[in-house]
């Protein structure tokens, strides 16, 4: 997308491909316009698998929703914008809480979207997200990566072709 002139994009994972069998997870559910541009990311906590799909705190969640796993495609120009935002963040947020203040890129991008200063194309992926939210997730993730190695998806020496 970026090599063809796009400015900003984000991988949109299908929610059902990002859930843990071992408990609730937090996911950023994407809202988009009719052209597939990101309009908002709604951080949703404690999303759990159910017999019929998924829910968060008793509310049914569409398992086909696209979610952000913070895989952004950004151009070098974005670094200038990011730096300006960081200066403002450092002046306003750090003095109040110097040990815990965090400059979160998704929050910053959300502010830019709200202000109309940025657009982000959501690129749907049907791939599985291999997360390890719970200790019990480790075995399944290891098994999945072992299978991908056996099937040639990845090489044992991941960077051998660089």
Region spans (language model):
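Hydrophobic helical membrane-anchoring modules
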Residues: 117-119, 126-162
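Conserved core of the sugar-phosphate nucleotidyltransferase
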Residues: 1-72, 76
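A C-terminal functional module that forms or caps the active site or interfaces directly
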Residues: 83-118
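Residues that scaffold the ATP/ADP-binding catalytic core of kinase and kinase-like folds
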Residues: 41, 81-82, 141
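Glycine-rich "substrate-gating" loop/helix at the edge of Rossmann-like oxidoreductase active sites
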Residues: 69, 95-98, 127-129
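Alpha-helix/helix-capping structural signal
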Residues: 76-77, 136
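Residues that recognize and position ribonucleotide moieties
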Residues: 71-72, 102, 131
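Glycine-rich loop/turn
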Residues: 54-60, 110-125
């Amino acid at each position: 997308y970026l090599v063809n002139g796009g400015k900003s994009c984000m991988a949109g994972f299908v929610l059902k491909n990002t859930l843990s069998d071992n408990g609730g997870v937090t996911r950023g559910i994407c809202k988009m316009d009719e052209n597939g541009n990101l309009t908002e990311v709604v951080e949703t906590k404690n999303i759990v698998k159910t017999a019929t799909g998924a829910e968060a705190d008793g509310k049914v969640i569409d398992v086909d929703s696209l979610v952000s796993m913070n895989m952004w495609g950004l151009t070098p120009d974005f670094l200038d914008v990011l730096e300006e935002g960081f200066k403002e963040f450092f002046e306003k947020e750090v003095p109040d809480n110097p040990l815990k203040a965090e400059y979160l890129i998704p929050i910053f991008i959300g502010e830019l979207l709200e202000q109309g200063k940025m657009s982000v194309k959501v690129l749907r992926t049907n791939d599985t997200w291999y997360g390890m939210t719970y200790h019990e997730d480790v075995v399944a993730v290891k098994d999945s990566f072992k299978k991908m190695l056996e099937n040639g998806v990845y090489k044992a020496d991941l960077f051998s072709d660089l």
